Amino acid sequence: MKKILLTLLLALPFCMVAKAQDFRVGITGGYNLSSPSGYKSQSGFHVGVKGELGLPIVTKGLYMDFGLMLSSHGWKSPGYYYDGNYNPSAGEKPDKPSSGYTSDNKCTPYYLNIPIHIGYKFPVGRNVSLFINAGPYFNIGLFGKAKETITPDKGTATTKEMVGNVFSDKMLNRFDWGLGFRAGTEIARHIQLSIGYDWGMKNINKSGVDNKNRTFVASCAYMF
């Protein structure tokens, strides 16, 4: 059912394009700052294509905004300190230092990000407009790794791969969805600068730990 709904939502803008007079495409990219609860924030990026479909039949300035982007998310653990008194029989790995050490974990999943927003633009000058849009987004997990860095009290830090693919290895759910908004300015009808935020509504962690995507976004786009 989710796949059918997603397919219909993706097809809607393209079905409307055939009769639309106010349709534009462009390229977009920018910065992500992911900060799921309980973890340190991690920087990422997004890059891809976007489209805009004007809806003057409803009211002037109203439009649909949608995109197809590669987007990196993730998080870092706060850094847990161990005094070296681990117990191998309890499932702890014997390759850890016998002295005290700090364990830092980092997870970097990559998604196919599909936002579908409704927005409004209003001019504030001859070649400048302000805009705001909001709506759902859908994420489809593509690939990503989880790594652990061990920093002993004495010695050199080492990093090793814990999970080769966070989606295939049953660490994260492949499908995610949520709500987002963007606000920004458009210059000369071509250059768009915006900031926004995405609230994930689905728990992405398969272990049962409550872990939802929370992402600050800053973007730059060029519309043709």
Placement of each model-derived feature along the sequence:
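Transmembrane beta-strands of outer-membrane beta-barrel pores
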Residues: 31-35, 53, 70-74, 110-113, ...
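Repeated loop/turn-to-beta-strand initiation elements of outer-membrane beta-barrel proteins
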Residues: 23, 58-62, 189-195
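Residues that define the transmembrane beta-barrel architecture of outer-membrane proteins
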Residues: 21-23, 41-47, 108-114, 128, ...
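Membrane-embedded beta-strands of outer-membrane beta-barrel proteins
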Residues: 27, 47-51, 68, 114-118, ...
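Short glycine/proline- and aromatic-enriched beta-strand/turn motifs that initiate or cap beta-hairpins
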Residues: 19-54, 141, 150, 223
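Outer-membrane beta-barrel "beta-signal"
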Residues: 185, 212-224
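Extracellular/periplasm-exposed beta-strand and loop segments of Gram-negative cell-envelope proteins
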Residues: 35-41, 73-110, 141-176
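Outer-membrane beta-barrel strand-turn architecture
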Residues: 53-59, 122-126, 187-189, 224
